[in-house]
Swiss-Prot record:
Transit peptide start-stop: 1-53
Cellular component, GO, one term: chloroplast
Function: Aldehyde reductase that catalyzes the reduction of the aldehyde carbonyl groups on saturated and alpha,beta-unsaturated aldehydes with more than 5 carbons.
Protein name as catalogued: NADPH-dependent aldehyde reductase-like protein, chloroplastic
Location of the protein in the cell: Plastid, Chloroplast
GO MF terms held by the record: oxidoreductase activity, acting on CH-OH group of donors
Keyword NADP appears in the UniProt entry: yes
Catalytic residues of the enzyme: 178
Record organism: Arabidopsis thaliana (Mouse-ear cress)
Lineage of the species this protein comes from: Eukaryota, Viridiplantae, Streptophyta, Embryophyta, Tracheophyta
Amino acid sequence: MSTHSSISQPPLPLAGRVAIVTGSSRGIGRAIAIHLAELGARIVINYTSKAADAERVASEINDFPVREEITGKGPRAIVVQANVSEPSQVKSMFDAAESAFEAPVHILVNSAGILDPKYPTIADTSVEDFDHTFSVNTKGAFLCSKEAANRLKQGGGGRIILLTSSQTRSLKPGFGAYAASKAAVETMVKILAKELKGTGITANCVAPGPIATEMFFDGKTPELVEKIAAESPFGRVGEAKDVVPLVGFLAGDGGEWVNGQIIPVNGGYV
């Protein structure tokens, strides 16, 4: 009796596609980049200042077993330094992807973002910190989306996925500038999805709740972390692995009919 079905590997739904994942040297972005690579995509690992971390992610992906479905020249993953709030650097990031993989970009996941670990009230938020938050979180999402809208492959498979936050719904004190910067992105993506009519490119936001990353823990006491965990129906904060399956679904063909949506993934936190 043939044992082919028991030893055959599962199909790779993103084989032959190129994905840029911003802010993917660590945290949720890192987990997303690895997951999309596991689904067959070739990946741009983007970072701003953590070069060694980005190289480790790319090395991990490039060490994946060879699969014949993954076609195209070059490595499975490359590393590109780019500040998403700088237009020329965003353009260069797309240029690098097209050059390295000799193919158009199919998927943009914008995971780059910052959060002020001082958690100031709006009254105590400095103008400089406010501007910096919006520069990265909002302007960065805008610039990446703008470039993607003009350069992603059209006719099917084009995906723009922007990470926002469940803070736009929980409205916790101390997150004023951060939540506002993410809420702006959520409004923008709803309009973007309509403007992309006829291209076959979808645009959505994924809005995680509290996720156990370096950015989440920064500035929080153990007592505060426990309090946040207790607010979840699961009694814990989320992990990056709780977010990546949704991003993988949206990036694939099965997610085509999901468009212009803000999708919370927070375990019932909000």
